[in-house]
Curated annotation (Swiss-Prot):
Keyword hit for Zinc: no
Claim: Transmembrane is one of the keywords in the record: no
Cellular localization per UniProt: Secreted
Gene Ontology annotations for the cellular component aspect, listed alphabetically: extracellular region
Secretion signal, residue range per the UniProt entry: 1-26
Disulphide-bonded residues: 55-76
Protein species of origin: Portunus trituberculatus (Swimming crab)
Keywords: Antibiotic, Antimicrobial, Disulfide bond, Glycoprotein, Secreted, Signal
Classification via InterPro entries: Anti-LPS_factor/Scygonadin, Anti-LPS_factor/Scygonadin_sf
Protein name in the entry: Anti-lipopolysaccharide factor
Gene coding for it: ALF
GO biological process, any: defense response to bacterium
Amino acid sequence: MRKGVVAGLCLALVVMCLYLPQPCEAQYEALVTSILGKLTGLWHNDSVDFMGHICYFRRRPKIRRFKLYHEGKFWCPGWAPFEGRSRTKSRSGSSREATKDFVRKALQNGLVTQQDASLWLNN
């Protein structure tokens, strides 16, 4: 019985060696391209038509206390002397909260009506 077990183990070892994947060359270019694509996607700048005015939005990553946050900034040069700002853990949340902050400030300064502001603040 011992010879059978040893023979079975030897056969299993030979089969495993034949079917093990062969080492291949690492594809660093594809890996680096993928990582850089993800990192550059964290920054975003755009312009939007907001209530008939050209406004701008910027989102950028920020690490605070070993956590990733997204800081958003929304401003409309030539219409409002202030800007909306936010810091959230969500990329899309940073744009939404910066816009809401801008609308709150625009309402306080009389640039928008309560009705127009409620459309943005209730969502």
